[in-house]
Amino acid sequence: MKFIPFLLLGSILVAPSVHSHGGHDHRPAEETMIPGSNKNGIEINLYRDKSCGCCKKWGARMVDVGYNVVDNVSNDINDLKISEGISSSLASCHTAFVEGYFVEGHVPAKSIAKLLREMPNIAGLSVPGMPIGSPGMETSQMAAESYDVLAVDFDGKVSVFDSY
């Protein structure tokens, strides 16, 4: 019976890496740090498809302002969105999590800082779609679009959190 605690400890030590958000577990296919991440900064877990370059650019913008961004390449990004209650009308190409909130799409660092400063009673923020000019979607070939950052409450109701 003395070896049971060691078995429990051993099973904990060899368990696969799992991230839990909103009570859901997500096992990434690959997990790496975005280069330049501040290991002492607030951690953002970014989930994206392997082929999405603008998602990685968004992560780099978050690193630029001091966040520690964990890049999770996922094979089930749509399943993740469904399990987190992110409707298709709010969806974008990537989903991130910070301090218990979801951050869907190309949400600017300024809005994330406001979210973490105010800590509202919401599920998360969303920038639906992929607006040109939003973080990770910058281009010199097209004018930036105006867009809203939406606050999403736990019932799925939305309100404007910020406008750009």
Place the predicted regions along the sequence by residue.
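Sec-dependent signal peptide recognition
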Residues: 2-9
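N-terminal signal peptide c-region/cleavage motif recognized by signal peptidases
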Residues: 15-17
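A short beta-strand-turn-helix
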Residues: 25-41
